[in-house]
Amino acid sequence: MKWVTRAKVKVDRVACPWLIRTFIDRDADFLFVPVDEVESVARKTGAIPYDVAGVELGHHGEECSFDAIVKKYNVKDKAVDRLALIVRGADTPRRDLTPESRGLEAIAEGFKRLAAAQGYDDQETLRRERHLYDALYLYCGGDAEKLRRD
């Protein structure tokens, strides 16, 4: 599967690829483009758009894109449900939704600044933050056997 979203990833646009590669498609490809190009790139490449306004796998009401993907792909995992609350709090104005949400938002902002300072791209951000989400998943009671080993 191929996916596309806005460039300059943070929280939801990092958590969603982690979710997809862990529970839906381990070989998923992700494209990061300027927001005004997401729709056209999705059409041209057949990529599934996420975390942009007006798409199925975006924010709806108080929920974020992570929630939408969990529902659409029927991910049934209690630790993912708990992680979804943390991500939702970090990615929406509801920072107090969980005690961990503010911390995740702060760490995500730090990674964003690190990427800007060191000049690495969104793919590298995904690579660097993958273990953060693995750790959060285990903190939420997840099964280590479900995590990618590559």
Question: What residue spans do the PLM features occupy?
Answer:
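Extended, well-folded catalytic/binding cores that form a central cleft or groove in large enzyme
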Residues: 1-8, 17-150
